[in-house]
């Protein structure tokens, strides 16, 4: 069973994020191309756990990260379930949506309320989480009013 370093918060600086109550580490880990189907699970796990052992508490994903869209969230979810679940309250997990994920009028690139809500639901399922700390829009499109996107993210 994974036991994080007891000194993990001693050397990492944390900064307040805007006007929110979040304090983000000076260094975050983005899980894009190194967390897809072509990558070794043990290496992915080592990257995440080593980062956490050194005070990295923010892990950034997106619904389309892979390769194979969604695969980074699936792999992170497995690592989270097997190792980090007891430390959920110490983590900042962010994900985003905006690129094509499924066929049909609501699965393509966009920022509609329908697309963003469905994308968030799918991301939560892939990661096995009840919530993410930050959800944001990855790619604006001219066919969705900015107000619709902003109200959905509020």
PLM ranges: what are they?
Residues 1-91:
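N-terminal binding-site loop/beta-alpha segment at the start of enzyme catalytic domains
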Residues 57, 61, 95, 144, ...:
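Ser/Thr-centric signal marking residues that sit
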Residues 88-101:
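A short, structured active-site edge motif that brings together acidic residues
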Residues 29, 61, 95, 134-137:
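Conserved beta-strand positions
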Residues 100-154:
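Glycine/proline-rich, positively charged
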């Amino acid at each position: 069973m994974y036991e994080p370093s007891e000194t993990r918060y001693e050397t990492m600086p944390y900064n307040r994020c805007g006007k929110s109550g979040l304090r983000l580490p000076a260094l975050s880990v983005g899980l894009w191309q190194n967390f897809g189907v072509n990558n070794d699970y043990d290496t992915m796990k080592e990257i995440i756990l080593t980062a956490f052992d050194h005070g990295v508490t923010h892990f950034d994903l997106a619904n389309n990260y892979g390769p194979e869209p969604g695969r980074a969230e699936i792999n992170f979810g497995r690592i989270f379930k097997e190792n980090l679940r007891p430390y959920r309250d110490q983590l900042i997990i962010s994900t985003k949506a905006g690129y094509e994920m499924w066929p049909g009028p609501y699965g393509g690139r966009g920022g509609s309320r329908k697309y963003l809500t469905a994308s968030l639901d799918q991301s939560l399922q892939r990661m096995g989480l009840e919530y993410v700390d930050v959800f944001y829009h990855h790619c604006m499109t001219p066919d969705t009013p900015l107000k619709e996107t902003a109200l959905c993210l509020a």
